[in-house]
UniProtKB/Swiss-Prot annotation:
Pfam families: HCS_D2 (PF22617), HMGL-like (PF00682), LeuA_dimer (PF08502). Transmembrane segments: none annotated. Residues 6-269 form the Pyruvate carboxyltransferase domain. This is 2-isopropylmalate synthase. InterPro entries: 2-IPM_HCS-like, 2-isopropylmalate_synth_dimer, AIPM/Hcit_synth_CS, Aldolase_TIM, LeuA/HCS_post-cat, LeuA_allosteric_dom_sf, LeuA_bact_synth, PYR_CT. The lineage of its organism: Bacteria, Pseudomonadati, Campylobacterota, Epsilonproteobacteria, Campylobacterales. The gene is leuA. The keyword Transcription does not apply. Gene3D superfamilies: 1.10.238.260, 3.30.160.270, Aldolase class I. The keyword Cytoplasm applies. Residues 394-511 are annotated as: Regulatory domain. CDD domains: DRE_TIM_IPMS. NCBIfam families: leuA_bact, PRK00915.1-1, PRK00915.1-3.
Amino acid sequence: MKDNKIIIFDTTLRDGEQALGSSLGINQKLQIALALENLGVDVIEAGFPVSSQGDFKAVQKIASKVKNSTICALSRVLDKDIDMAYEALKVAKHFRIHTFIATSTLHMQDKLKKDFDEILSMAKRAIIRARSYTDDVEFSCEDAGRTPIDNLCFMVENAIKAGAKTINIPDTVGYTLPSEFANIIKILFNKVPNIDKAIISVHCHNDLGMATGNSLSAILQGARQIECTINGLGERAGNCALEEVVMAIKTRKDYLKGFYTDIKCENIFKTSKLVSAITNESIPSHKAIVGSNAFSHSSGIHQDGVLKNRQTYEIISPSAIGIHENRMLMTARSGRAMIKTCLENLGYDENTYNLDDVYERFLRLADKKGQVYDYDLEALMFLSYENEEENKFILEKLSVISGNIPTACVCMRIKEELKTEACTGNGPVEAVFNCIARITNLKPALKAYSINAKSSGVDAQGQVDVDLEFKGRKFHGKGISTDVIEASAQAFVSAYNAIYRSLKVEERKMA
């Protein structure tokens, strides 16, 4: 291995899963593991086999299916843990046993009720036992960030002598600051005589928001493995996020001494979305690298800069992580340059419209609606302001019966006519969608559906957002209500009205 290669050790399936309200199923874990393999992760920590039969089987199945990544299993410094880890891993093409014990005074005295010599003896014995199964053994000094430095140096030296090939230095509770954590790694390299016989790894938690910073500071002092998770999943405030350290290393090679990883960065975004969907853990909109706002621009000044040169406000190209869609949001903060560019993208020559007039009407619509979409802007070109927000479809009444056969009855006003339909579906939301499709005689495909709480308490409002695809174009709808089914119906009707206006625009174009 080249000295500037940073090994990426992903622990989404072990440490990340510990943050979830419920355990993942075996097939869900396998799906994530295969995605991590496709991402180019070097080491996948698949689980903690001794913790449950389900975890054992999951590690075993992942070990049998993944061929290009090393599969790792966690164990305490106990014979039964190490033996169980081996039994789960032995079918793997490449595997690692990862054993650990706490080394801080606080943990030794209050949790383990043992002194340092006892802990040292247990660690060495565990490493030797793990080495009887594989040459690839990792040892972690739990709570290393709060371990007296002389004790930590002595533990690391003896763990390497016992046969550990990777020594992991965790900031278990996210307590240290980057300069402080970097100094710990620096001292280890200066004081541990056999440090060159092992790879030094770091595992940083995010309790003070320092996980990524601590990990990067550590590689500058000699660490060559970073333990991380997709989307920063993990106990409490989470772990170092894989996408953050990988893109920091890629983006700041000038400062980070030419370090690199083998991660296929173009797969980062889809892997992030997959993990979010399987774990049911939403990605915060402002999350670095993969959040929905990470490459979004709504300020007119920022949009103007990006339109002239993306590097003015984007240090990473969205395509670098696999995002290929436009994230320029049209809001009341957008300037004329943004509106002109959007119209050009829609195929309109600037000689065919008055930009000042369109922009004035755009601002009125944006103040009323919030976010304006390209089809809304196009409607401004052909429909008068009084009519572009005129809704052909109005939801009048809605009733739903749940149970074995979910059924919805929807009444809608179309112009002056009332139309009612009743439909079944695979759940009440689909039943409502089927009713609206039948009433409108339009058959779009539902591409995205999300629910977010807008307030708290028993009378909390929920916001439903939907994306419908019709004739190759996506249309967005939003609904808000204390009743999620009603909010869903509102969102569907909103999107259907956008489709209607789009069809009306097409008619005007053909006239």
